[in-house]
Amino acid sequence: MIKYTIDELFQLKPSVTLEVNFDAVEFRAIIEKVKQLQHLKEEEFNSHHVGHFGRRRSSHHHGRPKIKHNKPKVTTDSDGWCTFEAKKKGSGEDDEEETETTPTSTVPVATIAQETLKVKPNNKNISSNRPADTRDIVADKPILGFNAFAALESEDEDDEA
């Protein structure tokens, strides 16, 4: 880039003013050409930068967007058991054919049991606008003492009646 001194800039200052009736058609043609070039550059950029880079992000969080993944498939049989079906990472048919043709070792393969876990949130730590129920608060308090003899006596009385 060419650098000019202040004196040179004052000499290069245009002394001619534009006429009131200048040709706007040429000016608009130049603007349209620039718009087309910018559009082509954006298309080229988007073709190379696929994925979340092409998306616009709001400026308040400055983070990458969270890409949602599909939920795993869980099937429930007639007995009520739920089984988790994992994604297959490749074609298993090719691997089975290779192992059948070349029996090199007869080591048993360990399989991982697949289970579905249900997680319950700890509701005491979740804030709410609704006031707490006193029955829940009483149920959460630990029992300070337990009289085993009183419990045995009450069971014996129930058996006799």
Swiss-Prot record:
Pfam families: CAF20. The modification Phosphothreonine is found at T99, T101, T102. The modification Phosphoserine is found at S78, S91, S154. Keywords: Cytoplasm, Initiation factor, Phosphoprotein, Protein biosynthesis, Protein synthesis inhibitor, Translation regulation. GO terms for biological process: negative regulation of translation. InterPro entries: Caf20. Disulfide bonds: none annotated. Residues 52-72 have a biased composition (Basic residues). It is found in: Cytoplasm. Its main location: cytoplasm. GO terms for cellular component: cytoplasm. GO terms for molecular function: eukaryotic initiation factor 4E binding; translation initiation factor activity. The keyword Phosphoprotein applies. Phosphorylated by casein kinase II complex (CK2). It comes from the Eukaryota. Residues 52-108 are annotated as: Disordered. Acts as an inhibitor of cap-dependent translation. Competes with eIF4G1/TIF4631 and EAP1 for binding to eIF4E/TIF45 and interferes with the formation of the eIF4F complex, inhibiting translation and stabilizing mRNA. Binding affinity for eIF4E/TIF45 is 10-fold less than that of eIF4G1/TIF4631. Required for induction of pseudohyphal growth in response to nitrogen limitation, probably by regulating STE12 translation. Belongs to the CAF20 family. Interacts with TIF45. This is Cap-associated protein CAF20.
